[in-house]
């Protein structure tokens, strides 16, 4: 009995550390959703040297949340080829409404909160809405969640 009292605690501790080391890590994100003024948003989108994919989304939007992993994957694939992906949160609750989703999913592109004003300015009628921007001009608007293959093709076309 005395033997178990000395041997059992180190064994339990070793097993606990072993179990914890196999726990999958949460996605590490350094993206902080910040408020953006309309003029600054225009600067980002109207950059003449940029091929951008701008994602209008909201935390409460199920299709937006479902599409984010695809966008994260495509951003990884194309960011070194000149794609600039920008997320625009249209939540009424401010930047903090989208932050938990950005952290949980490990979003790897900047996300800004633009609020209700951007809904009217960019004529967003449904979410998600993606804007393909080339040389400062919106060349295509994609409304609704789309497949990875569809978006991949659109991004390849944009980068040509």
Q: Which ranges hold each PLM region?
A:
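N-terminal targeting signals for export/organelle localization
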Residues: 1-35, 141, 152, 160
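A short beta-strand-turn-helix
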Residues: 31-52
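Short pre-active-site segment immediately N-terminal to redox-active cysteine/selenocysteine motifs
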Residues: 49-52, 56-60, 126
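Hydrophobic beta-strand anchors of alpha/beta hydrolase catalytic cores
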Residues: 53-54, 85, 130
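Conserved redox-active cysteine motifs that mediate thiol-disulfide chemistry
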Residues: 56-73
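Thiol-based oxidoreductase modules, predominantly thioredoxin-like and allied folds used
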Residues: 82-96, 107-116
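Short, internal strand/loop/helix patches
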Residues: 102-134
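Non-catalytic, surface beta->alpha helical segment in thiol-disulfide oxidoreductase systems
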Residues: 125-126, 131-160
